[in-house]
Amino acid sequence: MVKVRIRSPAWYDGVDNTPHRSYLRAIGFTDEDFTKPLVGVLAAWSELGPCNYHTLELAKYVKEGIKEAGGVGLIAPTIVVNDGINMGTPGMRYSLISRDLIADTIEAQFNAHGIDAWVGIGGCDKTQPGIMMAMVRLDLPAVYMYGGTAEAGWLGERELTIEDTFETVGSYLAGKITLEELKRIEELSFPTYGTCQGLFTANTMAILSEALGLALLGSASPPATSARRKAYAVASGRAVLKAAELGITPRKVVTYDAIYNAAVTLFATAGSTNAILHLLAIAYEAGVKFTLDDFDEISRRVPVIAALRPAGPYAMQDLDRIGGAPRILKKLYKAGLLRPEALTVEGETIGKLLERWQPPSVPEDGILYSVEKPYKPYSGIRILRGNLAPDGAVMKIGAADKLKFEGKAKVYNGEAEAFKAVAAGEIKPGDVVVIRYEGPKGAPGMPEMLKVTAAIVGAGLGEAVALVTDGRFSGATRGIMVGHVAPEAAVGGPIALVENGDRIAIDGETGRITLQIPQEELERRRKNWTPPPPKYSGGLLAKYAALVQQADKGAVTAIPLR
């Protein structure tokens, strides 16, 4: 029997802790239970949306695995903000904020109660990095487990994901489909609980949890409705006590090499640009120096090998059918693109796990490609720099057919203004839509622009218009879109100085973004610029705006920034 009681004796052993034991006896603890490791089961659970609807049930299966391995599991919740439901509303300001809040709530709960080890179950976009940040912050034995993707919907022979609902709004506004057709997409696109079905932010972070070594190999792809999801829950409960017995903690796993492997995997799958922010934040919590320069260098050597939405036509359940994330990782490993000595929570290096893993005997069906003959010859994401983004920006080139664009700026001080312009037909081919004051401090919360980007694509302007913002993009975004512009407008970044009619050049091949005005004119505008007053004087959003760092630092909340 495993007996790894790292911290709990200080809470529950001895005469002086008699009252503490009394509390737990009230929920069924026995004398024997107090001799076992106390293992937290963190469930990011909520009925406010489908993504985390089932995680409480999965937590009970995790407890079974913990019990089998000789521990006692205790379930604790954390908050969930459903990104999709909040898209284009004031609620989206709470999305990125929730990532750091989740990490904070886990720290508070588990440090306050003397937990020896824990398993974190995530679902919707920010629950996953929030849990992983807490894993390395607490540095207790821990395993991450994904709640799983929703099943794709079907309209005849057409496979649907939630991406279709956002884009068909644009099609409807452009007069391309009827209201009845839009309603049909609404009804069919999201048929089960689980997360958004394409390689959007949730599924991106799930795959990266395997690449980082924080989750069991193969655990990312089974749908939320699959019986294998419950089996992985039990296995994760057993695995965390094995990790404790071996002395493996997240900071031994999340090294530079692990972040490197995650970055390679992100670029090879054309995953969500949000993952750049989240990997920077996880690296920060782990004390690992990893910057946009590292991402830039890696991105120039890794092609896209996965045809997953929005870069391709397939959903996460299609990837699961051919072996899931391990099939991607093994291709990258065999091509020499991964650092195989990175340790995992399973107690072995990722290289050893991948050597042993064998893919199922099913064809890849155009879902995956080889590194030698990739789906796209370039990376899924490019880091951009230039006089419009001195500290960097990101462009999801894997989901765009054009890598270069030049046009005249149409400037909007917020997403709502921009969406009204798209809906009114004011955006024309050749425009560069600039949405500013939507950064970490300015919004605050760096909201996603999916409502606008999807409306642009749905209107048939996806390759005829570019969008530049100091905000973020949903993982479902496609087209010529540049986000995370740093410094943001609210702190006086050059994006605050752009005027209607200015020409902007975007080059996804070389990684440059240029505001084509003389430097003297830029300086003249800078002298005339005044910072806007804070949007909030109290409450959570005001606290966040005061603490949050810029996008190139992962938008972490920190005093001081290490």
Curated annotation (Swiss-Prot):
Its EC number is 4.2.1.9. It catalyses: (2R)-2,3-dihydroxy-3-methylbutanoate = 3-methyl-2-oxobutanoate + H2O; (2R,3R)-2,3-dihydroxy-3-methylpentanoate = (S)-3-methyl-2-oxopentanoate + H2O. The active site is at residue 474. InterPro entries: DHAD_IlvD/Edd, Dihydro-acid_dehy_C, DihydroxyA_deHydtase, DiOHA_6PGluconate_deHydtase_CS, ILV_EDD_C, ILV_EDD_N, IlvD/EDD_N. Keywords: 2Fe-2S, Amino-acid biosynthesis, Branched-chain amino acid biosynthesis, Iron, Iron-sulfur, Lyase, Magnesium, Metal-binding. GO terms for molecular function: 2 iron, 2 sulfur cluster binding; dihydroxy-acid dehydratase activity; magnesium ion binding. GO terms for biological process: isoleucine biosynthetic process; L-valine biosynthetic process. Mg(2+) binds at residues 83, 125-126, 448. Its cofactor is [2Fe-2S] cluster; Mg(2+). The modification N6-carboxylysine is found at residue 126. This is Dihydroxy-acid dehydratase. It comes from Pyrobaculum islandicum (strain DSM 4184 / JCM 9189 / GEO3). The gene is ilvD.
